[in-house]
């Protein structure tokens, strides 16, 4: 059984870095308020209605946690105008960069949360997501920092609640320790199935997977990322069957 570290409720990571350009600061001041999720207006126990977040009806709702500079988020929004995307990122520089791309491309199917994503997850209704992305998160490589990693048993419970049956959890990392951690915890969770059938399924970027800035840096440094796709099992499935179902590819092909 994978270890279950107690989750650290505090936030760790940078919120601010080098000073923002004047144009990006202007976007933070003027554009961000209109795109920010309206969590402040929710009562206790109340949840957002995804249908009311976007200017037109959307067929699916996707969430990206820690979108970095927004390359993947904005590219997916442009490629899938029928999908509503929510992006969460606490680093002000990344939020400003994403706003610049949103402004340049004119996409209108993105909503943002520039704070801790743990404030968003309880406000979303059950089964509302068809895809959930955790791409190149901080690996927190030291053992004593394991509680700070995004992939945790309690967080996977949140993801399982939010993903619709058959929905996808997509995780990417160039840190093999984090990849093994992810596989250990996600495949141990009864709600998820790893979709890989062979090593090429996780060693090669899927065709619809947009390269991020962090991924490009990893490749330039000679680090080979892993691309993991997990599928949300049907809620109506027999629990005994879930426990016995294969997690994905054979052990010989694992990272």
Curated annotation (Swiss-Prot):
Record pathway: tRNA modification; N(7)-methylguanine-tRNA biosynthesis
Annotated binding of substrate, by residue: 142, 174, 212-215
Pfam families assigned: Methyltransf_4
Gene3D superfamilies, A to Z: Vaccinia Virus protein VP39
Coiled-coil ranges from the UniProt annotation: none
GO molecular function: tRNA (guanine(46)-N7)-methyltransferase activity
Keywords attached to this entry: Methyltransferase, S-adenosyl-L-methionine, Transferase, tRNA processing
Active site (UniProt): 138
Residues holding S-adenosyl-L-methionine: 64, 89, 116, 138
Catalytic activity line of the entry: guanosine(46) in tRNA + S-adenosyl-L-methionine = N(7)-methylguanosine(46) in tRNA + S-adenosyl-L-homocysteine
GO cellular component annotations of the record: tRNA methyltransferase complex
Domain of life: Bacteria
EC number from the UniProt entry: 2.1.1.33
Summary of the function given for this chain in its UniProt record: Catalyzes the formation of N(7)-methylguanine at position 46 (m7G46) in tRNA.
Family of the protein in this entry: Belongs to the class I-like SAM-binding methyltransferase superfamily. TrmB family.
Annotated protein name in UniProt: tRNA (guanine-N(7)-)-methyltransferase
Protein's organism: Rhodospirillum rubrum (strain ATCC 11170 / ATH 1.1.1 / DSM 467 / LMG 4362 / NCIMB 8255 / S1)
Lineage, highest ranks first: Bacteria, Pseudomonadati, Pseudomonadota, Alphaproteobacteria, Rhodospirillales
């Amino acid at each position: 059984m994978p270890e279950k570290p107690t989750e650290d409720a505090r936030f760790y990571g940078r919120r601010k870095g080098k000073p923002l350009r004047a144009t990006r600061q202007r976007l933070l001041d003027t554009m961000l308020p209109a795109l920010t999720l309206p969590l402040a207006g929710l009562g206790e126990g109340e949840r957002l209605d995804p249908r009311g977040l976007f200017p037109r009806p959307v067929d699916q709702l996707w969430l990206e946690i820690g979108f970095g500079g927004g390359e993947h988020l904005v590219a997916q929004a442009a490629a899938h105008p029928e999908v509503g995307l929510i992006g969460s990122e606490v680093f002000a520089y990344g939020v400003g960069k994403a706003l610049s791309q949103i402004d340049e491309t004119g996409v209108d199917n993105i909503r943002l949360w520039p704070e801790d994503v743990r404030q968003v997850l309880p406000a979303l209704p059950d089964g509302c997501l068809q895809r959930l992305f955790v791409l190149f998160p901080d690996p927190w490589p030291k053992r004593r920092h394991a509680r700070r990693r995004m992939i945790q048993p309690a967080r996977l419970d949140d993801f399982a609640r939010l993903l619709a049956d058959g929905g996808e959890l997509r995780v990417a990392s160039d840190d093999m320790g984090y990849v093994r951690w992810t596989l250990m915890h996600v495949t141990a969770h009864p709600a998820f199935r790893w979709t890989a059938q062979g090593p090429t399924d996780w060693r090669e970027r899927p065709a619809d997977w947009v390269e991020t800035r962090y991924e490009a840096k990893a490749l330039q440094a000679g680090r080979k990322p892993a691309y993991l796709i997990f599928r949300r099992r049907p809620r109506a499935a027999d629990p005994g069957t879930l426990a016995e179902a294969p997690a994905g590819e054979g052990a010989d092909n694992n990272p």
